[in-house]
Every structure is written in structure tokens, then in C-alpha cells.
From Swiss-Prot:
Pfam family of the protein (one): PROPPIN
Stored SMART domains: WD40
CC annotations in GO: cytoplasm; cytosol; phagocytic vesicle; phagocytic vesicle membrane; phagophore assembly site membrane
Tissue specificity field: Expressed in neurons and intestinal cells.
GO biological process: apoptotic cell clearance; autophagy; autophagy of mitochondrion; cellular response to toxic substance; dauer larval development; determination of adult lifespan; embryo development ending in birth or egg hatching; embryonic morphogenesis
Organism the protein comes from: Caenorhabditis elegans
Compartments, as annotated in UniProt: Cytoplasmic vesicle, Phagosome membrane; Cytoplasm
Protein name in the entry: Autophagy-related protein 18
Residue stretches of each WD repeat: 100-139, 142-183, 186-226, 232-271
UniProt free text on domains: The L/FRRG motif is required for recruitment to phosphatidylinositols including phosphatidylinositol 3-phosphate (PtdIns(3)P), phosphatidylinositol 4-phosphate (PtdIns(4)P), phosphatidylinositol 5-phosphate (PtdIns(5)P), and phosphatidylinositol 3,5-bisphosphate (PtdIns(3,5)P2).
Lineage top rank: taxon: Eukaryota
Amino acid sequence: MSATTSEENPDSINYIGFNQDSKVICVGHKDGYMFYKTADILENNTLTYEGENLTHLGLNNCLIIERLFSSALMVVISQKDPRVLHVYHFTSRNIICDHRFNKSVLTVRLNRDRIVVCLEDCIYIYNLKDMKMMHNIMDTPTNKLGVLDLTSNPGNALIAYPGSTDTGSVHLFDAINLSSVSTFNAHEGTIACLKFNQEGNMIATASTKGTVIRVYSVPNGHRLFEFRRGVTRCVNIYSLCFSSDSKYLTSSSNTETVHVFKLEKTEGVDNKPEASTEGGGWFDAINKTFSAYMPSQVLQVGELMTTERSFATAKLPGAARSNQVSLVSHKNQQYVMAATSDGFVYAYRLDPEGGELDLIKQHNIGPKSDTSRASPTSTGSGGAAKSAEASNQSVPNMDDPDDFPPMSHTSG
């Protein structure tokens, strides 16, 4: 998401997005961050949030806020110096480490094994446990929008990013074994958005034209589904997201319409692989490994579904500067949830029959909202001393997957 400076709008939201499993909405603003639970958005009339003012740390105007699932570990990119990545533990109120780069950070993705940092022309990979750099992918095709995604399932860390500035190719890189996996042609135009499903065996893609959304199997790059939006005009696709069971895919754009596509198999349609692979026998081995975890619709790589219209749509009350959309599973029901940069979140119940979805919840979020803080952690003046004291009193457990210990180290 593009940032808006505080001079343009003192109360603006600079960043908004969902965490890896869509259980938390992350908001970055001029003074700090706010986290909202999606379950609270669906269940409560009044929202609470976890948040903190980070100005005492010099982190004014948070441009990127990413949280590791529902843990206390998060990363911050501040407008004070967008070339610096701050890894922060918000329970102990301690900066774990800083990593400085020679260009602005455009995108950050986390899973339980890796932190992946995307610059305009290179990608850095860090080990989450000790925050040490594992690898850097140099001289990547110019990626001014920071288009990149990382799988979130345990033990798997595939990175996807555009493979060309001229065509719509997608490159997959294994961030565990630190080696290239495959490259496949997804669109004629350049890639504008891409997103893995939660199992890491499918990826959705959209080009800068925005009229066609496709789904490919991972890692071999077979086209599984192709969806055409309901209008012919070009749009900017802001976000893509699979449901947790990979039965639905949703997209948002610079229009007021959110589209939901149903991932159903169609019998008797042949499809050819679109991947050019690297690694020979190694690729065959990893392909078999991934196949063991693929759902049935992914294994049927010969079956391609093409639809001219979305399965369901949701109308946003207005077109914001930007938005992010997700499919949230709550109490055996699927919901479409859209969070906008003008400080609103909208929830729609996904009807199994599709069609136009009804708005069931609407909340204000961000610094201008009337929400209350659930667990105040802001320190104000003297916050650094309190942070050190808090981290000494309660050291997080290294073996707890939802917690990681504060460590001190800075990379140049």
C-alpha cells in the first residue's frame, strides 16, 4: 500500500493489511500501529485494539506494519528512514534488531521460518530465529510496487515475485533451501498482484490490466483456473486472498466492487503446463513432496475452469485510496472482509449461493476511530528505560511458536 504523509492528512492511515491467517488487521499511522481481531469485528458492536505510540522510539509515520500471526513479533518501516527494517517485540516493548538497506523497503513478508524483505531490485531473506541474513537475491527485475508473497504454512517458505518487467512471468524461490524452483508465464502483461493460498500449493495472479485473474498450481505452474471480471475496463488490483480451505478466491481493486470466485473443477478440459523449471531431479523431488499435501482440485492439473463472471460480489460504500480484502472463516461461516485506507472495515456474509452479498458489519478503524485500546502498551517519555525493564522481567520463550526472545543486533 502506498503511504500518505502526515502533512497531507495528520490522521491518515499509512498502511493497512491482514496477517498471515486473516485473524488480525494491521494498521500503521503517523504515531504508531493498531491491531484489530477479525473475530471482534464480526461479533462486537464496539471494537478494541492492541496498539502503541512509537514516537518515543523515533518511529514516526509507520509505512509498513506486519505481524507474525497473533504473536508479539512485528516489523516496522518508518517514514523517518524507509531504508531501515525494525523488528519489534511489542509485549516486552523492545526493538529486537534493525536492518539497514541501501534503498527503501517496499514489502515485508513473514512466516515462522523467514523474514523476506523486498527492495526495488533485490530481495533479502532472514532467518526468523536469530534474525541473521541467509541469502540475498540480487538483480531481480525492477519491482517498483514491491510485488511479492511468501507461503505461510509451517516448514515451507516459497517466495513468489515477478520474473520480468516486460511479460507476466512469475518466479518461485525456495527460502529454506535457498534455491530457485521454477518460472512460469502467468499473463501477457506485467504482474501487479500475487497471493499464495494457506497451504502454499496454489497461487493467484493478476496483471497490470486487471481484467483476468488466474490460479496456478505450485510449484509446477499449471494453470488451474481463469476468471474474468464482470467489466472490460482495466483496473488496478489491490489485493487477492484465498479462503482457508482454498475453495474461494476474492479480489479488490480501485473500484467499489469486491469479487469472489469459486474454485470448482470442470471435467474434460485439457491444460498444458506453463512452467519452465530449474534443478532437474531436485525439482521432481520437491514436486512430489508438494503433491503429497495438495488438495484434490490441485492434483487434477488437467482440469481448467474458465468463468466470465464472479461467483459473488460485494459493494463497498465508496472507493478509498486503497483497500485490502480477505476471506475470514469464523464459526463455520465464511465472510468477506474489506479494510480501507480511509479508516473503515466492512464485513459481508458469504452466501453459498453467491450473488450480491449483504453488508452485516461496519466499523471505524485507525487513529480517528472511536475504538478503545485493549492492552495499552504505549510508553510515552522514558519509554526506552521501561522497555528494557519489561524485557528483563519477562523473557519470551524461544520454543513457543507464538513468541520469540528479544535479541540485540544491528546489520549495516
